[in-house]
Amino acid sequence: MRTSLPILALTSSLAPTNAARAYSEWLASSFIDRQTPIDAGYGPAVLWEGIARAGAHISPTSPLLKAAEAKVSSLVSADGTLDGWDPEWYSLDDIRIGNNLLYFYQRSGDAKLKTAADGLRQQLNRWPRTPSGGFWHRAPIYEDQMWLDGIYMADTFYATYVSLFERENVTAWEEIALQFDLIEEHCRNHTSNLLVHGYDEAKDAVWADPVTGASPLVWNRAAGWYFMALIDTLQVYPSDLPGYARLLGYFVTLADGLERSQDGGGGWWLIMNEGYEAREGNYIEASATAMFSYGLLRGVRDGLLEEKYKAVGLKAYELLVDEFVREDGNGTISFLGTVQVGSLNSNASFEYYTSIPLAENDARGSGAFLFAAIEEELL
């Protein structure tokens, strides 16, 4: 773990502290101590789900869990209106907060949270779709485009909602699986078992392959979002429906690709295409490493992956603690090394992805690290 304290102080003070305090509780508490705000964007949604899970990991009455519940509740008015939500604005990123609403609705039964989630679910019925039935990542900006990111943003919510309130809606379950099927058809490399960032069904984007419509590069966080989407959706998808076996196959296949592409130090490169590891500008990035660690450890715990993947996930987690967690000297810790963004609203080139700055305490990376830390602590 990195530290902002003098090097000589490490031997006497830092190691015992680390041994005594779980990283999930420590990082979650650090965000509370920093009075971190919330909005309905996907980044805060991931972070505050991580804080909520960290609290539940400790106790059903944990102050962390109560703090997260209060934050999420503050986004919804008494009549169930979600702050800033526009029912005519179609961006899959904006569906992600639905998971938080459902998490705390199950906990509290607060009807306003269900009402807000209902609005998101109904919006999915109206969502613009590709000719093959895939949700546009954003309308009208990304017409006919599907990104791996969007699967995590929307389909984990869609699956959770249907599991709670429409369990017998086979049409909905089939549509959820279809979103993964389309990504697999267009974005999977069957040699590396990794997936590129997204595809354009119309093949109009500057980056689109003229045959498949796929973008050219494997951006690690897009693959991380997709890996987490698979493991989280498999928690609620009915195992007796045909889609379950397909999703499980996609998950296991990606785990194989991750094992083979893991760097010797335990992390994953920002751009994961074979041969790019030594390319100047590429680097080991923290948020995706956390996402992969979480998915691998959770997959083993749930019996979906072979035991060998535990070592892969733990190696990644140990790297995160050693290289991307910093003690700040005031009782808090910070999570480092998260790339700020990656978008197909670009030329999708190596130079584009590697030009994006890194951030400290980024909500996306920190939330993913909380997920991974909980899994490591459950071992």
Regions found by a protein language model. Give the residues of each.
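Fungal secretory targeting signals
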Residues: M1-A19
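Residue-level signal for alpha-helical transmembrane segments in multi-pass membrane proteins
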Residues: S12-A15, L234, E377
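Acidic interhelical loop/turn segments
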Residues: S132-I141, I271-N273
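Extended rod-forming repeat segments used as scaffolds/tethers
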Residues: L10-T11, T156, F369
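CBM-like carbohydrate-recognition segments
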Residues: A20-A45, G50-G98, F104-L120, W127-W136, ...
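Extended ligand-binding clefts on enzyme/binding-domain cores
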Residues: L148-I151, D155-S293, L305-F350, E360, ...
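Short, solvent-exposed loop/turn elements at beta->coil junctions and helix N-caps
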Residues: D86, P140-Y142, D204, E274-G275
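Mid-sequence acidic-hydrophobic segments that form the walls
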Residues: F104-R107, L120-P131, F157-L164, Q179, ...
